[in-house]
Amino acid sequence: MASALEAIKYDRGRLFIIDQLQLPHVTKFIPIDSSEAGWHAIKAMQVRGAPAIAIVAVLSLAVEMLNLVSENMIPEDGEDVRAYIEQKMDYLVSSRPTAVNLSDSAQKIKLLLDQRARKSGLSGVETAMAFIQHAEQMLARDLADNHSIGEYGATWILKNTRAALEGGNTCVLTHCNTGSLATAGYGTALGIIRRLHEHGRLSRAYCTETRPYNQGARLTAYELVSDKIPATLITDSMAGQLLANPDKKIAAIVVGADRVAANGDTANKIGTYTLAVLAKFHNIKFVVAAPRTTIDMKTKTGNEIIIEERQSSEVTKIRGPCEGDGDHREAVMETIKIAADGIDVWNPAFDVTPAALIDAIVTEVGVETKDSSGQFHLSSLFESMA
């Protein structure tokens, strides 16, 4: 059964998202009624995960455009509206430059508007409505793609991992959050875990806490508990011991991606690279799950990927309700200092895992593995789109 968790609620002209900063203690939906509200929600990490970021960004502008249409504030000239939408999309991209889905969506929207508005001579309202329809189709397509990723990934793990072949059911480790809270729904890497569970082939999912922002402890654990999937939380530094323990029978590590370069190098949440190195040493499959929109064929290798560095307070402080607050719906969230005053902090949000450490890249159209020379050929994934 698919996940009942819904993190993005959209009806034409209305967008609400779960404020992920308050999870897992408080489940609160906040309205996003403009591109500015979308930008701030992305920047503040009230929404995160490359696919969800792109969807919320585009839908936030769709809501804004429909409001302008309803208030008769849309210019008559389609060219003026096209320029306005493109300017707003560039602004939204600046909220999270590492997430290729967002920049990819912006480029596709510019191409759409060029074809529809400029070449077809659409009016301002027609241009706005063409954009809104594109945004809504993007939401539906992402959800369908995630279900495909889940099926392809689960099937590959069951056919290609030692632990799965030896024991029937399987245990999987994941990092950060790649589920309904990171996508339109169901998830990418977490979608694979969901599919294994739906097939009755998952013994247990392990999730890292994912410091410093604790997406695993706050978000992935929240989703796993919500879906009643057998799961165990570990700290990031326990991963090596988990993989080394033969009783745990970890079949694979499955992660998402913020950007995949043309050669397969993958930028993802900080700590992913460490897990890939551990997987290689312990001969455990390392699987990246991502829609094709996350693959950036213009970026040749991971060396070209810009790594966002975030503020030191994410490392030196932690936020949550006091343990004795009882009903968390009414709890007062507090920020606690956990590091020595004056200590210098380096806080890269992502790292890049070399393609050499990745066994498979799962997309909505299938699973890509390396050839006999150890090279991915990701361009083949786009042949059907040519």
Curated annotation (Swiss-Prot):
Domain of life: Eukaryota
A GO MF label: S-methyl-5-thioribose-1-phosphate isomerase activity
SUPFAM superfamilies from the UniProt entry: NagB/RpiA/CoA transferase-like
GO biological process: L-methionine salvage from methylthioadenosine
Record-stated family: Belongs to the eIF-2B alpha/beta/delta subunits family. MtnA subfamily.
Transmembrane segments: none
GO terms under cellular component: cytoplasm; nucleus
UniProt keyword list: Amino-acid biosynthesis, Cytoplasm, Isomerase, Methionine biosynthesis, Nucleus
Root EC class: isomerase
Pathway(s) of this molecule: Amino-acid biosynthesis; L-methionine biosynthesis via salvage pathway; L-methionine from S-methyl-5-thio-alpha-D-ribose 1-phosphate: step 1/6
Entry EC number(s): 5.3.1.23
Positions bearing the site annotation: Transition state stabilizer: C176
Subcellular location: Cytoplasm; Nucleus
Active-site residues (renumbered): D258 (proton donor)
Protein name (database record): Methylthioribose-1-phosphate isomerase
Record's function text: Catalyzes the interconversion of methylthioribose-1-phosphate (MTR-1-P) into methylthioribulose-1-phosphate (MTRu-1-P).
Catalytic activity of the protein: 5-(methylsulfanyl)-alpha-D-ribose 1-phosphate = 5-(methylsulfanyl)-D-ribulose 1-phosphate
NCBIfam families the record matches: eIF-2B_rel, PRK05720.1, salvage_mtnA
Gene3D superfamilies given in the database record: translation initiation factor eif-2b, domain 1, Translation initiation factor eif-2b, domain 2
Organism of provenance: Uncinocarpus reesii (strain UAMH 1704)
